[in-house]
Protein backbone atom coordinates (compact mmCIF):
# COMPACT_ATOMS: atom_id res chain seq x y z
CA UNK A 1 0.00 0.00 0.00
CA UNK A 2 1.22 3.48 -0.76
CA UNK A 3 1.19 6.38 1.67
CA UNK A 4 -1.67 8.02 -0.21
CA UNK A 5 -3.56 4.72 -0.21
CA UNK A 6 -3.16 4.55 3.56
CA UNK A 7 -4.54 8.08 3.91
CA UNK A 8 -7.54 7.17 1.70
CA UNK A 9 -8.19 4.06 3.79
CA UNK A 10 -8.03 6.15 6.97
CA UNK A 11 -10.54 8.59 5.46
CA UNK A 12 -12.91 5.69 4.85
CA UNK A 13 -12.48 4.38 8.38
CA UNK A 14 -12.97 7.84 9.86
CA UNK A 15 -15.88 8.57 7.51
CA UNK A 16 -14.50 11.91 6.37
CA UNK A 17 -14.63 13.33 2.83
CA UNK A 18 -12.01 12.11 0.36
CA UNK A 19 -8.76 14.06 0.40
CA UNK A 20 -9.80 16.00 3.51
CA UNK A 21 -7.56 14.25 6.04
CA UNK A 22 -4.48 16.29 6.87
CA UNK A 23 -1.29 15.02 8.49
CA UNK A 24 -1.85 17.25 11.51
CA UNK A 25 -5.30 15.74 12.11
CA UNK A 26 -5.66 13.71 15.28
CA UNK A 27 -8.18 12.32 17.73
CA UNK A 28 -8.55 15.92 18.91
CA UNK A 29 -9.58 17.29 15.51
CA UNK A 30 -11.55 14.41 13.97
CA UNK A 31 -14.70 13.63 15.95
CA UNK A 32 -15.04 10.21 14.30
CA UNK A 33 -11.57 9.12 15.50
CA UNK A 34 -12.85 6.97 18.33
CA UNK A 35 -11.49 3.89 20.07
CA UNK A 36 -13.45 1.80 17.55
CA UNK A 37 -11.70 3.68 14.72
CA UNK A 38 -8.37 2.90 16.43
CA UNK A 39 -9.18 -0.81 16.30
CA UNK A 40 -10.04 -0.51 12.60
CA UNK A 41 -6.86 1.49 11.86
CA UNK A 42 -4.67 -1.05 13.69
CA UNK A 43 -6.43 -3.87 11.86
CA UNK A 44 -5.67 -2.11 8.55
CA UNK A 45 -2.03 -1.65 9.55
CA UNK A 46 -1.72 -5.32 10.51
CA UNK A 47 -3.42 -6.66 7.38
CA UNK A 48 -1.83 -4.31 4.83
CA UNK A 49 1.67 -3.94 6.28
CA UNK A 50 2.09 -6.97 8.54
CA UNK A 51 2.94 -4.61 11.39
CA UNK A 52 1.53 -5.50 14.79
CA UNK A 53 0.48 -2.53 16.92
CA UNK A 54 3.06 -1.80 19.59
CA UNK A 55 3.66 1.05 22.01
CA UNK A 56 4.96 3.40 19.33
CA UNK A 57 1.90 2.92 17.12
CA UNK A 58 -0.55 2.95 20.01
CA UNK A 59 0.93 6.21 21.30
CA UNK A 60 0.68 7.88 17.87
CA UNK A 61 -1.67 10.81 18.28
CA UNK A 62 -1.95 12.13 14.73
CA UNK A 63 -2.00 11.04 11.13
CA UNK A 64 1.54 12.38 10.87
CA UNK A 65 2.66 10.20 13.81
CA UNK A 66 1.17 7.07 12.23
CA UNK A 67 2.74 7.84 8.84
CA UNK A 68 6.13 8.53 10.45
CA UNK A 69 6.12 5.21 12.34
CA UNK A 70 5.05 3.26 9.26
CA UNK A 71 7.66 5.00 7.08
CA UNK A 72 10.38 4.23 9.62
CA UNK A 73 9.45 0.55 9.28
CA UNK A 74 9.54 0.64 5.48
CA UNK A 75 5.83 -0.08 5.21
CA UNK A 76 4.96 2.10 2.22
CA UNK A 77 5.78 1.33 -1.39
CA UNK A 78 5.23 3.48 -4.47
Residue spans for each PLM region:
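Phosphopantetheine-dependent thiolation modules in NRPS/PKS and related acyl-activating systems
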Residues: 1-78
Amino acid sequence: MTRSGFLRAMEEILDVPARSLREQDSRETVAQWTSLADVQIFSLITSEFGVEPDGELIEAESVEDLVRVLQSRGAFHD
